[in-house]
């Protein structure tokens, strides 16, 4: 119904397109003080990325190039599973409760990969890959 669609659109616009004032102030502070803020953030995300890569490479049928290069995203090779990236992403979400994007969301060349953001604490990354490692076709 149209009235519900209008309300949902308004909520979506406010959530997606309008950053809360607290977030705007935090972003402004980070930009104004980037010399003191940035190095610690870069190191934190680098540590998480290397930690996640090590966790991934211990799981059969999953692989990430080492050492990882780039930002806090990893592209995980899952071709040895014999499943599509959408199938693996859906199973991981359903069975391990870990969200990853199927590689084909980035085009045909992304098929056979999953994209993971290393933006959570290392303990969360470790738990996520422990759960994934217990799943068939990875660990069972």
Protein language model annotation of sequence segments:
Residues 53, 61-65, 99-104:
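A short linear hydrophobic-aromatic micro-motif
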Residues 1, 32, 77-79, 119-121:
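Residue-level recognition of strand-loop junctions within catalytic nucleotide-signaling folds
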Residues 56, 76, 116-118:
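Preference for bulky hydrophobic residues occupying beta-strand positions
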């Amino acid at each position: 119904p149209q009235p519900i669609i209008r309300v949902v659109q308004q909520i979506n616009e406010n959530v997606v397109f309008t950053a809360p004032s607290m977030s705007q102030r935090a972003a402004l502070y980070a930009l104004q003080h980037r010399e003191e803020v940035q190095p610690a953030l870069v190191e934190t995300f680098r540590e998480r990325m290397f930690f996640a890569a090590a966790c991934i490479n211990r799981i059969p049928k999953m692989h990430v190039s080492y050492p990882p290069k780039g930002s806090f995203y990893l592209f995980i090779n899952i071709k040895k599973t014999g499943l599509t990236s959408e199938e693996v992403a859906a199973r991981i979400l359903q069975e391990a409760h870990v969200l990853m994007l199927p590689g084909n969301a980035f085009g045909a060349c992304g098929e056979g990969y999953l994209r993971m953001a290393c933006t959570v604490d290392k303990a969360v990354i470790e738990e996520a890959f422990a759960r994934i490692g217990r799943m068939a076709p990875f660990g069972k």
